[in-house]
Amino acid sequence: MIAFSERARIIAVASGKGGAGKTNVSVNLAVAFARLGGRTMLVDCDMGLANAAILLGMPSAWTIGDLLAGRCGIEDLLQRGPGGLQFLPGHSGTGSGSTLSAAERARLMEALRPYAARFDHIVIDTGGGIEASSLALVAAADTPLIVLTPEPTSFVDAYAMVKALSVSHGTPSFEILANMAPHDVAARALFDKFRAIVTRFIDVDLAYAGAIPADPFVREAVLRKRCVVEAFPGAPAARAFAALARRMACPPPPLPEPILAEVGHGAH
């Protein structure tokens, strides 16, 4: 039986570039948490490409854009997804473009703050890249989870994100998830290489979160507008997401201030 916290553990899923599978990781991890029995919320904050709703097969009349514009409340926005997951759908493009402004970010976090005590996990699918809005969300989370793939561009861009978070926000530690790895040995080697290079130049701690294997069932699930954890629970990737959720389903370290009260004060 998983012991959950009295306050939500906030996990910000990020990558330095598009194409690393960040949204797939966010959705499947959140659903895996919910299937463990944890009270879980998934927040799609990728305002440029808000695709989590597609992977869940949950189109919405309302989005975060409507919440920020005052056209609806958060209760109007929340949708019940697989395993009892509560989903807050994102919006492709806000008034300020594809990223949240500091004011919009503050309004969103203020709306979410009362829910911190009602959930065990809040998974945030952040925007791709190293825009200030994405960095602030990642820096404020209990667990910054960086998605890394074997592609050289992913390696370079993940390095840039870790460096930006360390320099701009003083973020001291990260969990690194090897995604689309051909096998466990290659995934671990990818992490070891990344850690060796990062820690040579940046004073941060990197922990190996695990690996999600390259799996054709992931693509098949996307074509069905479902997440692989629900569509093909016996698939290698689905089993890996379930294992990742079990490893991460533990109480966060105690914090002096509620994390959601701090997110709005990140980089502008």
Predicted feature locations:
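Inter-motif core of Ras-like GTPase G domains
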Residues: P114-A117, E131-T153
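Conserved C-terminal guanine-recognition region of P-loop GTPase G domains, centered on the G4
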Residues: F155-G170
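P-loop/Walker-type NTP enzyme "switch/lid" segment
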Residues: L42-A117, F217-C227
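Gly/Ala-rich phosphate-binding loop of Rossmann-like dinucleotide-binding domains
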Residues: A34, V138, S166
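Acidic-aromatic/histidine active-site loop/patch
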Residues: M1-I10, C250-H268
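G-domain G4 guanine-recognition motif of GTPases
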Residues: G16, T149-P150, F174-A189, A211-V218
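Extreme N-terminal, non-catalytic leader segments
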Residues: M1-A20, N24, V31-G38, C72-D76
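Beta-strand-loop-alpha "switch" segments that mediate conformational coupling across diverse proteins
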Residues: F201-V229, F241
